[in-house]
């Protein structure tokens, strides 16, 4: 006569197996050739690192260094304050990066809340003082931009002062001629617009051929 099993004394690593059930294999079966199962043989050959004879095939890990070889701001080593790889722009590069800013020690038992805030304030002020911030270098960088893109700075330095806002800089060429529509105001602002109208504007034409223009637009 079989003894009765006390479930309270059965170890936790025991488990019950139902003899009436059968094991169901996982689908897809990882023991199969999944590349062939899903029809990826052609793609796998295109990206294979080695050929069937063992020779090198496609190089997947392409280096980015050749792509940035001509860039003046490239870094082979990520610059930090500690390694000094930032060059002349190091102080500007790190000034507003929280991960690279000098973090004051955490508030301890001997530091009051006011002392902690004062320490943070001194850290932020130091970001804009030498040697953390080089104003001469910033001025030099801006002057280089001005020499490289003179048209972008043309309206900023006329006569040693900032030029007034010119509404014609935002005007649209509605008639498509490249000239200002008002003949009286074309003396000083006779420059052609960069983007000419395609003729689809519904503005009222001011030229003598206005009727033909309207007919053409209606047909379109």
UniProtKB/Swiss-Prot annotation:
Region (Disordered): 171-220
Keyword field: Activator, Nucleus, Transcription, Transcription regulation
UniProt xrefs under Pfam families: Rox3
GO MF term set: transcription coactivator activity; transcription coregulator activity
GO cellular component: core mediator complex; mediator complex; nucleus
Start-end of Low complexity biased regions: 178-189
BP terms from Gene Ontology: negative regulation of transcription by RNA polymerase II; positive regulation of transcription by RNA polymerase II; positive regulation of transcription elongation by RNA polymerase II; positive regulation of transcription initiation by RNA polymerase II; regulation of transcription by RNA polymerase II; RNA polymerase II preinitiation complex assembly; transcription open complex formation at RNA polymerase II promoter
Composition skew (Basic and acidic residues), residue ranges: 208-220
Entry similarity comment: Belongs to the Mediator complex subunit 19 family.
PANTHER family named among the record's database cross-references: MEDIATOR OF RNA POLYMERASE II TRANSCRIPTION SUBUNIT 19
Assembly notes: Component of the Mediator complex, which is composed of at least 21 subunits that form three structurally distinct submodules. The Mediator head module contains MED6, MED8, MED11, SRB4/MED17, SRB5/MED18, ROX3/MED19, SRB2/MED20 and SRB6/MED22, the middle module contains MED1, MED4, NUT1/MED5, MED7, CSE2/MED9, NUT2/MED10, SRB7/MED21 and SOH1/MED31, and the tail module contains MED2, PGD1/MED3, RGR1/MED14, GAL11/MED15 and SIN4/MED16. The head and the middle modules interact directly with RNA polymerase II, whereas the elongated tail module interacts with gene-specific regulatory proteins.
Protein name in the entry: Mediator of RNA polymerase II transcription subunit 19
Organism: Saccharomyces cerevisiae (strain ATCC 204508 / S288c) (Baker's yeast)
Lineage of the organism: Eukaryota, Fungi, Dikarya, Ascomycota, Saccharomycotina
